[in-house]
A protein has these predicted regions:
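Short aromatic-rich membrane-water interface segments that cap or initiate transmembrane helices
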Residues: 47, 114-127
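C-terminal transmembrane-bundle signature of multipass membrane proteins
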Residues: 58-67, 198-310
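Membrane-interfacial loop-to-transmembrane alpha-helix junctions, especially the N-terminal start
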Residues: 76-89, 146-159, 209-218
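Helix-loop junctions on the outward
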Residues: 94-120
């Protein structure tokens, strides 16, 4: 998943409407009104250098390694493979991405090493994303104790949507068509909307243990926060794609030669940067932190503890 430019806010102090005399002026017979304070505009910018934040992503490495070790122990003790194996894939890839942050658009990297390149990162991310969304969909089916057909259908829609999103993100990388990233993220919006609807219905209509009902509450809470955020993300991706393509610019025809060239480009081209705009600004920083190093790993591990060991 991807994000774009930083946000900059301004706070203006309030003031009255009366005019004031300049400090240096010609004498006047009528006199001057009392001077009013000059107007001040305070700028509160987003940090332009993300270097400290990118280093802080390393804190996600021991977190994911710990979760991986605990999950592997649960699996060795006979835990549910449909819950635990997807989690193990996710934890290992998330630790990797905390070590070697990458942004596909522009092949932006923090560490100038082949391990940060877009192609290997995307291959690993494909397995990770499909795995953990499959786990989330399996959770819905496990908690659908009344076997409601349309709830199961929504859970499988999540798997289909993440598969379609993989198609679009790979197409964006291999054809350099930035607009395709929008459709990738639209797939994520659809699958989490399905997860939120299914979780809400099950929570309202199904009698579950507190721990299992808590999983539905987590899904609902995430959906209420993520879906509005994703709307902003989609808008920013759309605007960014338009800003990088002029109206008269025709995309290069999609040929095997184009795909091969962009694959080689994604494997070998790296652009080291710590500029906030290159990493997607506030949206990009929020996404990386929550996805690899905090919220999603914690959520997936909680699923493992509740359903993977019973």
């Amino acid at each position: 998943m991807n994000a774009i430019s930083s946000w900059r806010g301004q706070i203006s102090t309030s003031h009255g409407g009366a005019t004031h005399c300049p400090r240096i002026h010609l004498p006047c017979s009528t006199g001057c009104e009392a001077r009013k304070p000059t107007h001040r505009v305070l700028s509160v910018p987003m940090p332009t250098d993300f270097r400290p934040f990118l280093w802080l992503l390393l804190l996600g490495v021991p977190l994911n390694v710990y979760f991986f070790a605990k999950g592997a122990g649960f699996f060795a003790d006979g835990g549910d493979p449909k819950i635990i194996l997807p989690a193990l894939i996710f934890f290992s890839v998330s630790a990797y991405r905390c070590l070697f942050p990458n942004r596909y658009e522009g092949n932006v990297v923090f560490h100038d090493t082949k391990l940060s390149a877009s192609l290997p990162t995307r291959i690993l991310s494909t397995f990770s994303e499909v795995a953990y969304i499959y786990q989330f969909s399996h959770v819905i089916r496990v908690l659908n104790v009344n076997e409601i057909g349309w709830i199961d259908a929504l859970s499988w829609l999540m798997v289909v949507a993440v598969g379609v999103s993989q198609f679009f993100v790979w197409s964006a990388i291999l054809t350099n068509r930035l607009r395709l990233y929008v459709y990738e993220e639209l797939g994520w919006a659809i699958l989490f909307a399905a997860n939120t609807v299914a979780s809400g219905y099950l929570y309202a209509t199904t009698s579950l243990s507190p721990a299992r009902a808590g999983l539905l509450v987590l899904s609902l809470g995430f959906g209420f926060v993520y879906l509005p955020w994703q709307f902003l993300h989609l808008r920013s991706l759309w605007l960014n794609a338009g800003a990088n393509q002029t109206e008269d610019e025709a995309p290069e025809p999609m040929t095997l030669a184009l795909i091969k060239r962009n694959a080689v480009h994604a494997l070998h081209t790296r652009r080291p940067s710590t500029l906030s705009g290159d990493w997607g600004g506030a949206i990009g920083l929020t996404w990386m932190t929550a996805y690899w190093a905090s919220l999603i790993p914690l959520w997936i591990y909680h699923v493992v503890r509740v359903l993977g060991t019973t």
